[in-house]
Regions:
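Conserved phosphotransfer microenvironments
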Residues: 47-70, 82-84
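Acidic, metal-coordinating helix/loop segments flanking the phosphotransfer/catalytic sites
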Residues: 30-48, 52-55
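Two-component signal transduction core modules
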Residues: 49, 76, 99-100
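Two-component/phosphorelay signaling modules centered on CheY-like receiver
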Residues: 10-29
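Conserved phosphotransfer cores of two-component systems
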Residues: 42-44, 67-73, 94
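Alpha4 helix (beta4-alpha4-beta5 surface) of REC/receiver domains from two-component response regulators
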Residues: 62, 82-101
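CheY-like receiver
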Residues: 108-111, 120-138
């Protein structure tokens, strides 16, 4: 089972994303505070985080560098309808793996699923269990 953190302040988006991944061989963790996300990231238990624009009153642009300092191998997928190119460029420099739109339509859900599959494939090198590969990146 692949562990996936959903860190989004909007409960509707969080619930919707949980439904998208709930039956797809993923163990979903949806903490309600930054400190709980940091705890999981520091323990290197979850190799992929789906991060909204704002989480626990903290903008993604402030949170991403902290998450990457806690675990440089963490894969962050920004799930946002943000359209500001300068901001998206900044977040890419900070280390996001991918920017996906909030899954409002079927195409958005498919895109998000594909981005997460790709993230886990990169972590595992297309072979072996995710947990072992993630622990090997410590």
């Amino acid at each position: 089972m692949r562990l996936l953190i959903i860190a989004d302040e909007d409960p509707r988006t969080r619930d919707h994303v949980m439904k998208v991944f709930g039956d797809k061989d993923y163990q979903i963790v949806a903490p309600d505070s930054v400190d709980l996300v940091l705890k999981d990231v520091l323990r290197k238990e979850a190799p992929v985080v789906l991060l909204g624009n704002v989480f626990d009153n903290m903008p993604a642009g402030d949170l991403i560098p902290i998450l990457k300092k806690c675990n440089k191998n963490l894969t962050i997928i920004l799930v946002s309808n943000e359209e500001s190119l300068p901001l998206l460029r900044k977040l890419r420099r900070e280390g996001i793996f991918y920017h996906a739109l909030k899954p409002a339509r079927e195409e958005d859900r498919d895109e998000l699923l594909q981005a997460v599959r790709c993230a886990f494939a990169n972590i595992t090198g297309l072979s072996g269990p995710v947990g072992a590969a993630a622990k090997g990146h410590s």
